[in-house]
């Protein structure tokens, strides 16, 4: 999980870790969106080639140039009409498997197959 709570954490997250650290081929494919009076929940497929460091998702991991495709959920909460916090969730084991850092076949990690299953609902 990543994101931020409060003005300063959100500013830092968006300006330093998140937006400027996306690989150029990043693609977000919407699956579903739920909108409430003070909250937004987005379910999506997040795909990219790991061509640069991504401190928000893979802190300290050098680029592997491998393709990654995962389901991702973002929950955004608003307070008084302003962004209060954003939490982003994904299956880190699937990411690690796809970039080659987790390869034990005995582990119950599905990798890109999870994104393919979620994509069936689109």
Language-model segments: which ranges?
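C-terminal and inter-domain tail/linker signature
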Residues: 1-122
């Amino acid at each position: 999980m990543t994101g931020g709570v409060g003005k300063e954490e959100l500013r830092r997250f968006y300006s330093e870790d998140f937006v400027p650290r996306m690989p150029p081929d990043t693609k977000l494919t919407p699956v579903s969106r739920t909108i409430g009076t003070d909250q937004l929940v987005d379910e999506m497929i997040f795909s990219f080639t790991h061509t640069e460091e991504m401190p928000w998702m893979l802190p300290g991991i050098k680029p592997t140039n491998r393709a990654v495709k995962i389901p991702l959920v973002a929950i955004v909460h608003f307070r008084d009409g302003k962004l209060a916090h954003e939490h982003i969730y994904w299956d880190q084991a699937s990411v690690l498997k796809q970039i080659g850092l987790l390869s034990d076949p005995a582990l119950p990690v599905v990798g890109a197959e999870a994104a393919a299953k979620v994509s069936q609902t689109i």
